[in-house]
């Protein structure tokens, strides 16, 4: 499925301002000010300068929290977003109840204690985010994430993303697959499944094991259209039911 740009000139703007460039600017800015986020339940609150809030928005990290404070802007980050900034980009620190967590392992263990499936979801999130795909929550579409080629203000999301492990019950039967594919197709998205291979149930799911030893397998699943295989169509067309393939574009 080709990118669906939201307005004329959006593609040119995206090419002129790649996400990777904005992320580099954000990384430098947050590191220089030694920005620190505060753990709050299953989110992280980050206080930043107005210019940094604009950079975070350009890079699609977090959501602005409305506040009467004018000097600082408050950004709410998901665990995946916060840990990506903390561990992968090394541009923010994380604190808990006023105490700065000394290393990434402490932060990792806290997030895993709040959300046991965090290792699997972070591995999937960092896999796509490291390839400069923009990820947002896919809750309203019945999936884990939606993936954008660039900022959501410029382009519609191309993929609805489901994260699975080897023992997951999702998409185990054909009816589940067809429902997921039809739902994604109805909102002009391709269903992308990310199979994260590893044992997530053991107590030894530590930081290094997850990030270095676990692997991610990408597959796209699309719906077969019977009208494309009628007798009056070219015999060179090849259709499959359903069409499952590796995501070569990522």
Curated annotation (Swiss-Prot):
Question: What does this protein do, in the record's words?
Answer: Constitutes one of the two catalytic subunit of the tRNA-splicing endonuclease complex, a complex responsible for identification and cleavage of the splice sites in pre-tRNA. It cleaves pre-tRNA at the 5'- and 3'-splice sites to release the intron. The products are an intron and two tRNA half-molecules bearing 2',3'-cyclic phosphate and 5'-OH termini. There are no conserved sequences at the splice sites, but the intron is invariably located at the same site in the gene, placing the splice sites an invariant distance from the constant structural features of the tRNA body.
Which protein are we looking at?
Answer: tRNA-splicing endonuclease subunit Sen2-2
The record places the active site at: 148, 156, 189
Quote the Pfam families the UniProt record gives.
tRNA_int_endo, tRNA_int_endo_N
Give a GO biological-process term.
tRNA splicing, via endonucleolytic cleavage and ligation
Q: A single GO CC term, please?
A: nucleus
Q: How does it assemble?
A: tRNA splicing endonuclease is a heterotetramer composed of SEN2, SEN15, SEN34/LENG5 and SEN54.
The Swiss-Prot or TrEMBL record describes its family as follows: Belongs to the tRNA-intron endonuclease family.
- Segments carrying the region annotation (Disordered) are 225-250
Question: What keywords does the record list, in alphabetical order?
Answer: Lyase, mRNA processing, Nucleus, tRNA processing
- Give an example GO molecular function: tRNA-intron endonuclease activity
